[in-house]
Amino acid sequence: MDTFLFTSESVNEGHPDKLCDQVSDAILDACLEQDPESKVACETCSKTNMVMVFGEITTKAKVDYEKIVRDTCRGIGFVSADVGLDADNCKVLVNIEQQSPDIAQGVHGHLSKKPEEIGAGDQGHMFGYATDETPELMPLTHVLATKLGAKLTEVRKNKTCPWLRPDGKTQVTVEYRNEGGAMVPIRVHTVLISTQHDETVTNDQIAKELREHVIKPVIPSKFMDDKTIFHLNPSGRFVIGGPHGDAGLTGRKIIIDTYGGWGAHGGGAFSGKDPTKVDRSGAYIVRQAAKSVVASGLARRCLVQVSYAIGVPEPLSVFVDTYKTGKIPDKDILDLIKENFDFRPGMIAINLDLKRGGNFRFQKTAAYGHFGRDDPDFTWETVKLLKKA
């Protein structure tokens, strides 16, 4: 049998880049909650004892940026310098200006345009992907790596493994076979976990508890065998972590946010951006389109691309590839996609309810993936059944 190996990684919410994504989206949530027409492009960076938020925000909302930064860091678990950051005592720098009037007039006419007239906030191309290899219609490598990271955080916060600290990374290699273009997982080849820990714990205890409390509950036993390789904290020591260990920046984990290296990526990040930014809204609608194609039984695997020009509502192009798994020709699937999905940014915002903030709506997306999540706030995961004519 001809097989191949493919690998996806994830990082959990205490990773410095992911901390920054969550701060940027917490600010977006706060703006949209009070003013759904907020225009937000919020970046965050972090290093030892410092978090800085900067960018362009035009909003009627009254937002305490410093409080949001501290609350977000505290919620992740950064409560003292020795775990990587002290939420209550670190420096918080804010450098936020209004959206450029040039962009405002071109995209939304200073809020005067109707939803169907709103132009894309920038040029760019975005990809959506779906595959029938998991119930989530997501790649198994990505699903397992992401769930391992989420489980690490769970057992840290519920004190099952009190020696854990917030920062951590996971990686999963799966052996696959190609079944006429569809991806069929056979077994998990390698599991890698590197997690921050306190000084009291031994490497043997780390490995034993990670197997018991993190790996065993997440990876189905049918995918494990006696040849599965485990690398558990292979560097030997990971006490210094979070922003103390490495600088963090919004938008540095775009593959973890999406499909773990499968499909394709146009390069635009999601966090801290309101829905006029097609980097985010465009990627969400093409995920819904690709997922709907697979869920409707029209293909076992699907990639959809959309592209935009700044200030122009209609997409420049829409592309579909079913990797030769389509039950009908790709051009017919493309016609169905165009009939069933409105790719104009103003309409995406309405149809996917993307102007609604608050309740951690977007902050939730900023750790453990934007896709394949079972949560009603993830409106782009709703399947539209597509019928071939």
Curated annotation (Swiss-Prot):
Cofactor descriptive note: Binds 2 divalent ions per subunit. The metal ions interact primarily with the substrate. Can utilize magnesium, manganese or cobalt (in vitro).
Subcellular location: Cytoplasm
Chain positions recorded as ATP binding sites: H15, D167, G168, K169, S235, G236, R237, F238, D246, R252, K253, A269, K273, K277
Cofactor(s) required, per the database record: Mn(2+); Mg(2+); Co(2+); K(+)
Catalytic activity: L-methionine + ATP + H2O = S-adenosyl-L-methionine + phosphate + diphosphate
Key words, A-Z: ATP-binding, Cobalt, Cytoplasm, Magnesium, Metal-binding, Nucleotide-binding, One-carbon metabolism, Potassium, Transferase
Binding site for K(+): E43
SUPFAM superfamilies, per the entry: S-adenosylmethionine synthetase (SSF55973)
E.C. number(s) listed in UniProt: 2.5.1.6
Origin: domain of life: Eukaryota
GO molecular function terms listed in the Swiss-Prot or TrEMBL record: ATP binding; metal ion binding; methionine adenosyltransferase activity
Transmembrane segments: none
GO BP term, example: one-carbon metabolic process
Positions of L-methionine binding: E56, Q99, D246, K277
Chain residues that bind Mg(2+): E9
Predominant location category: cytoplasm
Annotated metabolic or biological route of this protein: Amino-acid biosynthesis; S-adenosyl-L-methionine biosynthesis; S-adenosyl-L-methionine from L-methionine: step 1/1
Disulphide bond pairs: none
Top-tier EC class: transferase
Cellular compartments per GO CC: cytoplasm
NCBIfam families, sorted: metK
Family the UniProt entry places it in: Belongs to the AdoMet synthase family.
Subunit (UniProt): Homotetramer.
Function: Catalyzes the formation of S-adenosylmethionine from methionine and ATP. The reaction comprises two steps that are both catalyzed by the same enzyme: formation of S-adenosylmethionine (AdoMet) and triphosphate, and subsequent hydrolysis of the triphosphate.
Protein name stated in the entry: S-adenosylmethionine synthase 3
Source organism per UniProt: Vitis vinifera
